[in-house]
Swiss-Prot record:
It comes from Arabidopsis thaliana. The lineage of its organism: Eukaryota, Viridiplantae, Streptophyta, Embryophyta, Tracheophyta. One of its GO terms (cellular component) is nucleus. Residues 42-99 bind DNA. This is Ethylene-responsive transcription factor ERF013. One of its GO terms (molecular function) is DNA-binding transcription factor activity. The gene is ERF013. It is found in: Nucleus.
Amino acid sequence: MVKQELKIQVTTSSSSLSHSSSSSSSSTSALRHQSCKNKIKKYKGVRMRSWGSWVTEIRAPNQKTRIWLGSYSTAEAAARAYDAALLCLKGPKANLNFPNITTTSPFLMNIDEKTLLSPKSIQKVAAQAANSSSDHFTPPSDENDHDHDDGLDHHPSASSSAASSPPDDDHHNDDDGDLVSLMESFVDYNEHVSLMDPSLYEFGHNEIFFTNGDPFDYSPQLHSSEATMDDFYDDVDIPLWSFS
């Protein structure tokens, strides 16, 4: 009888230890997951989808609908898209993720309150900003810019010097030229693009995440023919910075 009671006590004790160890392991795993989640840098207007992509949208001024800005592989790219759209809508006083974006984009440097942009144009500007190299969002070196300008201004006939420029510089100049060329295409830009469902919850410019309702049941891609911006807008250009 004594041996049987001892055996029962030992078995119960082992079961308790196993349960305690399992609970401790689960708790540690949960804490580690939460810690990793907290380390992810948060950007205004950007949210991470469950499968890892980053999405962003922005509300059109004086409207309940939102302009879909795209789905991107990194949070930084989505944040650049949001910044470009917000800057188009609110001007230099906008609270941006990357404040120096205005010094690296020729187009964004030249817009003013008299500029008229359609939602489709804003989408295109956002996509260009998102796909730009991250180097574009680092303040340029004054010394390097001075040397580069001297080479172009004082030696315009030195084609061999231009041909020997590093490939990265050529790529940088091409991207800047693409942004500037957008100005000519805004008025006649009729390419089909996707837009978020206008019945979504409210989403303010200064919120870090979208509403907890997770309205993104799909990931529409730019240049899709299934839905057009005309379904939600009357193709009326938006006067910049004319709202609070």
